[in-house]
Amino acid sequence: MFDTYLRRWDLVPDGGPILSASGGVLPVTRHAQPAMLKVATCDEERRGNALMTWWNGNGAARVWLHDRDAVLLERACATPTLGELSAAGHDDDAIRIACDAVARLHAHRAPQPPATVPLRDWFHALLAHARDDGHDEVLRVSAATAQRLLAAPVDEAVLHGDIHHGNVLNFGDRGWLAIDPKGLHGERTFDYANLFCNPAHDLAVDRARFERRVALVADAAQIDRQRLLQWIVAWAGLSAVWSIDDGRTADTPLQVAMLAARSLGLK
């Protein structure tokens, strides 16, 4: 997977690989400069690589070299992470940092953005589950909310699609930047919703912390509180369906969806 690019781009391995079903990442150096080589083996990851290249370092890690299947990225600092900030009692700061990175991504207006997936397609699994009467009421509420949002989007943008505490990293003098996008297109508020399911269950489902986060994100992103809550309901439902389909627990997204629904008076 990596050997072709090690030769082509004159790279030296600088750590062990991280492999997945969708590709792999390898720490490397190039001319003594730390970097990360990311190789995609599926279209979703290729789409993300193309979007990273299009952002050109604006709110995202800088891409130094690229082709259809691979990108060579600047390497982040190991610490601190946003998850560590939240765990240390600085969750407000972590949320504001993530919101700033998202705003920079959405502000990018270079010509010819790469191919992206519409949000309606992204929500297919949730909308399909909603037709099954055997599923939990919260999923039906999530699906109905998603239907309304997707039918009348506002303030659309090219979206990262997977903003959470592990996908906004510290790049030292360059600040906090995003990695690993999905490459979507739709209402910009969507990109903030996944923050509410992260970085840990106990924090995500704490009602007081949830309400505090809603206020922080609405203010930092300059978005309507009610609209944000609706997108949280929709996103958390989709996340829960994915977890259920994969045989994993969906406790966190289901509880987050219920918190948002109750704040909206839907449950």
Model-derived features with residue positions:
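Regulatory N- and C-terminal appendages and interdomain linkers associated
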Residues: M1-D14, E45-G48, D136-V141, A208-R209, ...
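An alpha-helical support segment within catalytic cores of ATP-dependent transferases
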Residues: F2-T4, A107-G161, F171, D219
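Active-site Asp-x-Gly
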Residues: F171-R225, Q230, D251-M258, L264-G265
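A conserved alpha-helical element in kinase catalytic cores
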Residues: A32-L72, A76, P80-L105
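A general structural signal marking secondary-structure boundaries and capping sites
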Residues: W9, V102, H106-A110, P199, ...
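Conserved NTP-binding catalytic cores of kinases and kinase-like/nucleotidyltransferase enzymes
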Residues: M1-A60, H66, F171-D173, A260-K267
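Active-site acidic catalytic loop and adjacent metal/ATP-binding pocket
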Residues: I18, G24-T29, M36-L37, V63, ...
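Small/polar glycine-rich anion-binding or flexible loop at a beta-alpha turn
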Residues: A21, W231-G237
